[in-house]
Amino acid sequence: MASPTGTVAPTDFGRSGLLRWLVAIVAFPIGGTLGYALGGPAATVPAALISGLITGAVIGLGQALALGLRPQALVLWIAATAVGLGVALAIVTAIIGQIDTSTDAVLLGAVSGLAVGAGQAAVLLRERAGRALVWVGASALAWAIGWFVTTGIGVGLAPGWSVYGLSGAAVSQVITGVVLWKLLAPGEVASSAQA
């Protein structure tokens, strides 16, 4: 939930916030499907950028709604997620080509999580979440594990898919949800506001 000033209200996150965050899992397959359908397979840098931007916008929207962000912070979160995923996917595609192996997917996850996490951490810092920079590493790890889980259970996503499947989304949202729960704990926000 958001406070009247538009910041994340840490006392409201708790269990209900974590549950809302977990419901946002559905944004991953929806975003991936739209990104693939509208941007095409991420086989070229332009297609990767477009697909990543679309996918990231949908994921960012789902997550921002789960956080209960007010309009300005909501827009910033969506933009950070879209740009982070779009740029990361384009960079990885430029370096290694189309993602078609488990190793490529985990690398994409780490780079995407790092880029998305950096942008989202900036929003968390703006919203006075304590130790928001932890979010960058947690996101990189969660996104890499998400891709590992999806490819590890034998899900054969079509080459050029911009984001992992529902199984990977569940794992990454649990990891990041627990980190958010800690970052948005009342003592964490209060201590960062005093700093």
Locate each region found by the language model.
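Juxtamembrane/disordered regions of integral membrane proteins
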Residues: 2-195
